[in-house]
Amino acid sequence: MSELRFVRMGFGADRVEYQEAWDEQRRVHAARFVDEVPDTVLLLEHPPVYTAGRRTEDSERPLDGTPVIDVDRGGKITWHGPGQLVGYPIQKLPRPVDVVAHVRRLEEALIRTCAEFGLETSRVEGRSGVWVLGDPVEQRPVLGGLSLDFDPRLSDDEFDPRLNGPEYAPSNAGQRREDRKIAAIGIRVAKGVTMHGFALNVNPDNKWFDKIIPCGIRDAGVASLANELGRDVTIEEVLPVAERHLRDVLENAELKPRVIEKTPA
């Protein structure tokens, strides 16, 4: 794969308004499609903003009328703001694009980033993003001598069966306390080129998540590097580490088109 270009758009006092970043994404996307620029990762921090993906339900929006920007990515509603490292990888991939493989690569880079700071994270079966797993529950609920197996896959609209395999922790069917998402991922692919990307919680004020159901997932919490490690962690610390792991994972990936299974005649 060709070398990645990283663009640091703005952090801290120079945070980038969401609309400005979205416009820049579309500009770079168009340039990448015609090979005017190489694969590019925009890295930045936003002022506080809620964005809603295409599948967001009205019931998942803030109840107090807080403004929300509707965007053309997958997924549901989320928050971006101070203390969150946001990355928008704009890459040309072989068609038909294997979106799941792209998501897995972003997850891998973020898992490695968290590990470098001493935090173990994981994927969770059926759910995108990077997670801090809840502590094991010693005993599952028992009713009338029968062990109850609450399997969220039976009723969870957000469960994606494509997100599975040995690199995923089993979906939480009550065997763990609440899992906590530390990095959200939402992707759009147009003309074989990716847009949108990830948001890694470094040291945000988590009260912003209280107004919404983050990513439409009701049975999970929100994590950050600072809270999980019990110390202050800054974006300035995390930025070069995340860049390095993104470069390593994305530049060294063996890119393949999505395999389309043929239906028997």
Curated annotation (Swiss-Prot):
It is found in: Cytoplasm. Pathway: Protein modification; protein lipoylation via endogenous pathway; protein N(6)-(lipoyl)lysine from octanoyl-[acyl-carrier-protein]: step 1/2. One of its GO terms (biological process) is protein modification process. InterPro entries: aa-tRNA-synth_II/BPL/LPL, BPL_LPL_catalytic, Octanoyltransferase, Octanoyltransferase_CS. Gene3D superfamilies: Bira Bifunctional Protein, Domain 2. Residues 35-254 form the BPL/LPL catalytic domain. The keyword Transmembrane does not apply. The record marks K181 as: Lowers pKa of active site Cys. Its main location: cytoplasm. It catalyses: octanoyl-[ACP] + L-lysyl-[protein] = N(6)-octanoyl-L-lysyl-[protein] + holo-[ACP] + H(+). Its EC number is 2.3.1.181. It holds the Pfam family LplA-B_cat. GO terms for molecular function: lipoyl(octanoyl) transferase activity. Signal peptide: none annotated. Keywords: Acyltransferase, Cytoplasm, Transferase. The keyword Cytoplasm applies. In the reaction, the free carboxyl group of octanoic acid is attached via an amide linkage to the epsilon-amino group of a specific lysine residue of lipoyl domains of lipoate-dependent enzymes. HAMAP family: LipB. Belongs to the LipB family. This is Octanoyltransferase. It comes from Streptomyces coelicolor (strain ATCC BAA-471 / A3(2) / M145). The gene is lipB.
